[in-house]
């Protein structure tokens, strides 16, 4: 079945196929022209046509893949977070404020952090740093009004940098993750003459859920036990420094799927907070850590790729449960802090890539001896008469030669006699017949052409079974794997390990869909393959059709026309976790805004060149060219090439060194 522009296929059909209205969160939709729209402020009247944008960038000689960063989405996510907490604070009459501190580790790119610091400063938000490089960046980019929370393991130099910033009047809070860090803080504070402001991270009994549940609980990597926390507070009080402990921090996971875990954690942490106040700590802040989820699959569930709550519900629970515990204890409400990096950054980045080609899996071409009036039969039965129950009229077709082995004849009989009523029996018989053919072939008793005929007949049966099964209300378990088995592999110009590492490492789902041709009905079940030389470089789990699917519906490729796909919600962790597998480097990155309905390209960050990625692994251009020159001179001396060809060879290598690491799809 080909993909055609059909009035029966609508924009609504495309939206349901790719679930864009479920995971798009108001930022992504489909236009009347069948292209993907991006609405950074969730205002449909202020939208960017993704296909038009990519075409414009192509006119600037910017090849795909390209990572598009929409600054407006970053700003909108920060404002929405602020609005939700302000609503909760107002509704519950909470007597303090809220701040988000963005963990730089989520997306360390300077342009991204600058956008967040700029918008965050207006809202009173801050930065979380988990290493010395991140702290240096945070202090340099922020001002005195930007709070900086320092997490992670720390050495003397890390702590000295933090306390020196405190001495400058900066609001920097080093958080004690293990007991020895408090010793360092006290020593450095005494050395530089600062009365330190300190936070402590506690290990809660409450654990998160899903793949990040190990971030919380007694066995978590970071934090102090409650016993250690109290012992260190007693130590500070004995030194007349109880007022220095001002922040309590906990963390139950990077993505909290079930709101119940958050409620339990807040209640537990709030109880600890009020007890610290009673014991003499100068508490001011309750840092609830990360975990505010992102609904990658649009299911609004507690699955690992979703969340069963809204941002407003999250804010309400944090405020309400903290307030309730503090009011019961007669303790002032703390200033609330969250480290909601994933929720802020995920939506703003979109990776666009071009399809390079397709490999069909389980080709259903029938053997050459199956003909109708001299023409080979196609697997969709075009031009073939069917009887009243759907079987093929065999009088028009030739069967296998008599010399062919019996299992091949069995496959042929099953194919031509298959109906809705006997399709399961035929399918099972076909599996047995194919196994017999493979055994005969391995034993040297089945010629290669008969093996090809058997495989073609088997896949033709599978295609026909899948076609007949589409009318069934409930597909039998034996047939549920057919879409996956018969799916095409669409090869796209990207590296999974560079641009979507979480898809490979932890089976993270990311929405993927074409950015154009969405008014055409897609007809191909597909999985995606990248261009690395690694069998793991594939995507075979997708957000579509109302849930997680093993294949993605795509359109047949058209000769001479590009077919472009986008991966959405890759703004959190993917860029910084990406690696140089096969030396595919960073993609081009483009920062985009919209003003009065006009798309503005704010900046273009060119992707890595071949020379740059070779430099990362200690190769030098000069040395490589010198080595090549030696080979060229040897080839000239041996008469393999002339001087003109030598110049062409060296020039080609020099061009390659300055070129993009990804494949070129431009025609020369």
Curated annotation (Swiss-Prot):
Substrate binds at residues 286-296. Catalyzes the biosynthesis of agmatine from arginine. This is Biosynthetic arginine decarboxylase. GO terms for molecular function: arginine decarboxylase activity; metal ion binding. It comes from the Bacteria. The gene is speA. Gene3D superfamilies: 1.10.287.3440, Alanine racemase (3.20.20.10), Lyase, Ornithine Decarboxylase, Chain A, domain 1 (2.40.37.10). Its EC number is 4.1.1.19. Belongs to the Orn/Lys/Arg decarboxylase class-II family. SpeA subfamily. The lineage of its organism: Bacteria, Pseudomonadati, Planctomycetota, Planctomycetia, Pirellulales. Its cofactor is Mg(2+); pyridoxal 5'-phosphate. Keywords: Decarboxylase, Lyase, Magnesium, Metal-binding, Polyamine biosynthesis, Pyridoxal phosphate, Spermidine biosynthesis. It comes from Rhodopirellula baltica (strain DSM 10527 / NCIMB 13988 / SH1). SUPFAM superfamilies: Alanine racemase C-terminal domain-like, PLP-binding barrel. It catalyses: L-arginine + H(+) = agmatine + CO2. Coiled coil: none annotated. The keyword Lyase applies. The modification N6-(pyridoxal phosphate)lysine is found at residue 105. GO terms for biological process: arginine catabolic process; spermidine biosynthetic process.
